Amino acid sequence: MSRSLKKGPFIHQGLLKKIEEMNAKNEKKVIKTWSRASTIFPQMIGHTIAVHDGRKHVPVYVTEDMVGHKLGEFALTRTYRGHDDNEKTTKRK
């Protein structure tokens, strides 16, 4: 279920403040954040944001196609290593 239109999109205020300060100074530094629920705004385009995935910060370079999505969508929390292929060959014998 999506967020109500009258509420508007969510963004962590500290993150928005850092982005606006960097845009005013024309700086491009990596910004660390734990706010995976923050929506990506057009002001963030061109910045690299390090999003926490539960154990480390994953750098996410924001492009125009990402606007409207959440930061957490681009920092995966689970590692998938694939299924074991050896079981298939041993069962056929």
UniProtKB/Swiss-Prot annotation:
Keyword Transmembrane among UniProt keywords: no
Regions crossing the membrane: none
Nucleotide-binding among keywords: no
GO biological process: ribosomal small subunit assembly; translation
Matches recorded under InterPro entries: Ribosomal_uS19 (IPR002222), Ribosomal_uS19_bac-type (IPR005732), Ribosomal_uS19_CS (IPR020934), Ribosomal_uS19_SF (IPR023575)
Entry keywords, A to Z: Ribonucleoprotein, Ribosomal protein, RNA-binding, rRNA-binding
Gene Ontology, cellular component aspect: cytoplasm; small ribosomal subunit
Any GO molecular function: structural constituent of ribosome
Role noted for this protein: Protein S19 forms a complex with S13 that binds strongly to the 16S ribosomal RNA.
Entry similarity comment: Belongs to the universal ribosomal protein uS19 family.
This protein's name: Small ribosomal subunit protein uS19
Organism, scientific name: Alkaliphilus oremlandii (strain OhILAs)
